[in-house]
């Protein structure tokens, strides 16, 4: 499952050992504890600069975000891809669900990334 798999990849531990079970919901109060060792923290201690791009889904509160877990740069979604109103074809759609409007900010659709690569953007 999403959050649990990411926690294991970031820490090298079973997800339950670092307090992550299943997929974190938008109202979750937990996340990847900043005291937990991550591959990014390990690499940073050895002189590497770390970046992560894409979906994080290991906690949306400040203390759980990528920059508090060893990464120097981050670009992506904090939660799941279904947590903001964009159609899978990349078309901005109106979101009518009241719980989603309360839980997530309305984000703009990112355009003009076709045929671009991260080394050209960042």
Where do the protein language model's features map onto the residues?
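Formylglycine-dependent sulfatase
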Residues: 1-122
